[in-house]
């Protein structure tokens, strides 16, 4: 009886996954999402004259974007807390 309940539940889960996948293909959601992500990355790379979070920097120079500061310990831009 436990095995039949497990198989029935597994079948319902499989049906749900297949239905969701076919609906997502119709909307082309994954491709659209990826294209938007890469478009945002390209935009940031062209427009930014300063370094953002996690970018390598030289302590003492003002290379990081506003609200970021160059960490002298790690030598990358991090969020500036004002302390």
UniProtKB/Swiss-Prot annotation:
Domain notes: The presence of a 'disulfide through disulfide knot' structurally defines this protein as a knottin.
Disulfide bridge positions per record: 50-65, 57-70, 64-77
Position of the signal peptide: 1-21
Name of the protein this chain belongs to: Mu-theraphotoxin-Hhn2h
Tissue expression from the record: Expressed by the venom gland.
Propeptide residue interval(s): 22-48
One Gene Ontology term of the molecular function aspect: ion channel inhibitor activity
Compartmental location: Secreted
GO CC annotation, single: extracellular region
Subunit structure: Monomer.
Function: Lethal neurotoxin. Selectively blocks tetrodotoxin-sensitive voltage-gated sodium channels (Nav). Does not affect tetrodotoxin-resistant voltage-gated sodium channels or calcium channels.
Organism, as annotated: Cyriopagopus hainanus (Chinese bird spider)
Keywords per UniProt: Disulfide bond, Ion channel impairing toxin, Knottin, Neurotoxin, Presynaptic neurotoxin, Secreted, Signal, Toxin, Voltage-gated sodium channel impairing toxin
Family, per entry: Belongs to the neurotoxin 10 (Hwtx-1) family. 15 (Hntx-3) subfamily.
Protein's UniProt keywords contain Phosphoprotein: no
InterPro entries per record: Huwentoxin-1, Huwentoxin_CS1
């Amino acid at each position: 009886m436990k095995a039949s309940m497990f198989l029935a539940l597994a079948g319902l889960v499989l049906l749900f996954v297949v239905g969701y996948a076919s609906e997502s293909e119709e909307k082309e959601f994954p491709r659209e999402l990826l294209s938007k992500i890469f478009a945002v990355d390209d935009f940031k790379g062209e427009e930014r004259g300063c370094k953002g979070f996690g970018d390598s920097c030289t302590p003492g120079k003002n290379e990081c974007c506003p609200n970021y500061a160059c960490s002298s310990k790690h030598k990358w831009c991090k969020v500036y807390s004002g302390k």
